[in-house]
Regions:
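Shared catalytic-loop signature of beta/alpha-barrel
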Residues: 125, 131, 140-157, 162-261
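N-terminal capping/lid subdomain adjacent to the active-site entrance of alpha/beta enzymes
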Residues: 1-107, 112-121, 125-129, 246-263
Length: 263
């Protein structure tokens, strides 16, 4: 959409200005507060590789093994399950199994608004005893999310119904969403995300950094955003650890202890 086109232009302009002045982008945005940005593992259900028959992630045991593999390789201490694939009862069992396998670590669940309202209530109440970072878009729309707030005692997050300032104002009035997931493309660039984070801090909402399926260039925008936000309270999302290569020079950026150094 048009906002995402603005983001691409902003990224390029910030890069040009930084190169001209000889400074990193985070210096143009107020200066970094952290050298590394922590990330959560992103757990997807998967088909098996048709060539090898390996890599399937469908069962509880397969998902736990996949989560352990990612933790061992990258050092993640927060874990996100992308749901909305199987019946809620199966995904609930999978989610609880990962939490049990990663004691004391953060958990988050995102079914992309696929749950019915009743299923969202049941799922949310069934995981209240876990260490949940947040419950992301279990139902779709500000009004349903606000209704869910009355039944679930977990922070509710979104990257779908609060992605511009008009929606942010509506959320300020309804208090449907606790955690606004800032996406550098959805919001039209890094600077709008910083402005939105300031509004959220003023109004008592929390923020995190969202992933929309990035390569290295957009990942760099996420890292510079994460570096400068004083009210960043959660590990960022990223699809990045699922990539086998990247378009940037030197290959993919590396995780160290579940985090990536700000370039």
């Amino acid at each position: 959409n048009r906002t995402q086109l603005h983001a691409a232009i902003e990224f390029a302009c910030l890069d040009i200005i930084g190169k001209k002045l000889g400074v990193p982008v985070h210096a143009l945005l107020g200066g970094k507060l952290r050298d590394r940005v922590a990330f959560a593992s992103y757990l997807f259900y998967r088909y098996a590789d048709p060539a090898t028959g390996r890599g399937e992630v469908r069962t509880l045991e397969q998902l736990v093994a996949h989560a352990r593999e990612l933790k061992a390789k990258h050092g993640f201490t927060s874990h996100k399950l992308k749901g909305g694939v199987f019946p809620p009862a199966h995904e609930l069992a999978c989610y609880r199994a990962v939490a049990q396998a990663m004691p004391g670590e953060g958990m988050r669940y995102d079914p992309n608004g696929a749950l019915s309202f009743d299923d969202a209530v049941h799922f949310g109440q069934a995981i209240e005893d876990l260490r949940n970072d947040y419950y992301e878009d279990p139902v779709f729309g500000i009004a349903p999310m606000r209704a869910l707030r009355d039944f679930v005692r977990i922070p509710l997050a979104t990257n779908t119904v609060v992605v511009n300032f008009e929606q942010l104002a509506a959320n300020a009035a309804t208090r449907a969403i606790d955690v606004v997931l800032l996406d550098t493309t959805f919001w039209g660039g890094i600077r709008p995300c910083i402005k939105a984070a300031g509004v959220c801090e003023t109004l008592g909402m929390q923020v995190a950094v969202h992933s929309s399926g990035e390569l290295g260039i957009q990942l760099a925008t996420m890292l510079h955003l994460g570096a400068v936000l004083p009210n960043l309270g959660y590990a960022a999302d990223a699809h990045y650890h699922h990539l086998v290569d990247d378009v940037i020079e030197g290959g993919p950026l590396r995780y160290e202890g579940g985090a990536i150094r700000v370039p």
